[in-house]
Amino acid sequence: LVAAVDGFCLGAGFELALACDIRICSPGAQFGLPEITLGFFPGAGGVQRLVRTLPQSLALEMLLTGSRLDAEKAERFGLVSRVLPSDMLMSESLSIANKIAFNAPLAVRAVKEISRWSRDHSLEESLRYGNSLRWAIGQTEDAKEGPRAFSERRAPIFKGT
């Protein structure tokens, strides 16, 4: 999932953006979880995802004070992959999504699974798990189609099989 943020991204909207794989934003974007200032805290995974995305101290400052992060800081700390002018935001997010969709679906799913799994496991465990998934993906029709299409100088036609 690709999130394109143009303007304020607060509360549940920010929690939704945090659940996305890739985030881009416009220069005027503001990110925050202000729930603490209202007497409660984010309940849709915002706490858990923010501390996994930003440095602990910065994440906790935002969570405990309700403070916001601007676009420049969001890019510097890796919350967003890039900052683009508002008029380019949607076309670029669709371009990213299309590039992902063009790839083999099972391989895309495996990369997402390994990247999530690796957060909670050692490098050695992650490498073993990645190798087992790579072997499984290597047995698919899509894994045969990619090299075949390359050698035939044509675009691959991935079917998710």
Feature annotation, model-predicted:
Residues L1-V108, N131, Q139-T140, K144-R148, ...:
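Crotonase-fold acyl-CoA enzyme core
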Residues S122-L127:
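Short beta-strand->loop
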Residues S118, F158-K159:
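Short active-site-adjacent structural elements
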Residues S115-H121:
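Short, charged, surface-exposed hinge/linker loops at domain edges
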Residues I114, I137:
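Residues that form generic nucleotide/phosphate-binding pockets
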